[in-house]
């Protein structure tokens, strides 16, 4: 059994190795194959494990022995599902592994905006506290989360976890979800009402035809002029130029995003020039414990497939 990892470096490192997969066969790891390299490298594979590698007809057609594709991810829009169905290739994903991590990072971004940890740490590192006339210099204004209204767009497992943390901060929680849901202490409202009432708008929906470019000029204009926009979902849910303009024109108070439309970030990404904008490099999901959990799910999926009882099947 030959198992090929096509973009191992997106998950694997010295803290989270892939050695637990070797119980199932020979494991060949490639750090990050280009699209043009994939077809040749997986030609004799029985299984392919990937994260974001594009696996379409052209990259799969040489892999005559391929019976299984495992994903280091929940989303599978990089896989040609129809081709896999036609050729008897089982595709399994990994879900619900990053709920706590993404909720945690969401609040790391929110707290950075309101508590100014980065700015005050630099203030001290630059020696300015030593020169301060007071023990507590009010250089950057701070704000409490208690009493603020957070609006959660997408109320799946991550949105629900964010709501629970918000409640611990004594925040008012609004939520918008396309399907009807209920949760204690959460007021479900329309999308427009959420935009208009929220001090913080945080996005936790999948990227699909409904959510693509969901946040653009019109939506930012409906938000409070001191509101914080947070995106730890997918870059495609927002129009980056419109977010830039909303920030520059003081239509909203700030933005904190972990995902962009193009990743890694392009040299000329306009949000790098935006004011009051915090950007992290798509790492909300990536704590060591989270990647360990993901690796275990992927290994369990492989074992279940080999035993004839596949789980987490998407095709």
Explain the meaning of each model-derived region:
Residues 155-156:
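Glycine-rich Rossmann-fold phosphate-binding loop(s) that bind the pyrophosphate
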Residues 87, 95-149, 314:
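Phosphate-binding beta-alpha-beta segment of Rossmann-like dinucleotide-binding domains, i.e.
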Residues 31, 72-73, 89-100, 177, ...:
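Short beta->alpha connector loops at strand-helix junctions that form conserved
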Residues 91, 226-315:
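Rossmann-like dinucleotide-binding domain for NAD(H)/NADP(H)
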Residues 1-45:
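N-terminal glycine-/charge-rich "phosphate-binding" loop or analogous flexible N-terminal tail
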Residues 56-59, 178-270:
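Rossmann-like adenosine-cofactor binding region
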Residues 159-160:
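N-terminal Rossmann-fold NAD(P) dinucleotide-binding loop
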């Amino acid at each position: 059994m030959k198992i090929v990892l096509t973009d191992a470096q997106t998950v694997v490192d010295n803290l989270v190795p892939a050695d637990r997969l070797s119980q199932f066969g020979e494991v060949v790891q490639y750090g990050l194959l280009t699209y043009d390299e994939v077809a040749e490298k997986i030609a004799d594979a029985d299984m392919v494990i990937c994260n974001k590698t594009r696996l379409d007809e052209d990259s799969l057609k040489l892999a005559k022995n391929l019976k299984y594709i495992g994903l280091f991810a929940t989303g599978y829009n990089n896989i040609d599902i129809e081709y896999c169905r036609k050729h008897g290739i089982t595709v399994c994903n990994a879900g619900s592994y990053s709920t706590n991590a993404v909720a945690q990072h969401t609040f790391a971004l929110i707290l950075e905006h309101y508590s100014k940890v980065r700015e005050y740490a630099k203030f001290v590192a630059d020696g300015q506290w030593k020169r301060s006339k007071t023990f507590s210099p009010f250089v950057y204004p701070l704000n409490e989360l208690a009493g603020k209204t957070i609006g959660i767009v997408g109320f799946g497992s991550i949105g629900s976890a964010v709501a629970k943390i918000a409640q611990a901060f004594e925040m008012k929680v609004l939520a918008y979800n396309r399907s009807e849901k209920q949760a204690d202490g959460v007021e479900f409202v329309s999308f427009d009402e959420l935009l208009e009432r929220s001090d913080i708008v945080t996005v936790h929906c999948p990227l699909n035809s409904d959510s693509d470019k969901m946040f653009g000029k019109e939506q930012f204009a409906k938000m409070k002029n001191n509101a914080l926009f947070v995106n730890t979902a997918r870059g495609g849910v927002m129009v980056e130029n419109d977010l830039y303009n909303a920030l520059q024109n003081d239509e909203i108070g700030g933005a904190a995003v972990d995902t962009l439309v193009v990743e890694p970030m392009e040299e000329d990404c306009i949000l790098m020039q935006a004011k009051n904008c915090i950007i992290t490099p798509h790492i909300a999901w990536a704590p060591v414990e989270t990647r360990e959990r993901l690796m275990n799910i992927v290994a369990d999926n492989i074992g279940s497939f080999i035993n004839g009882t596949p789980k987490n099947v998407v095709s």
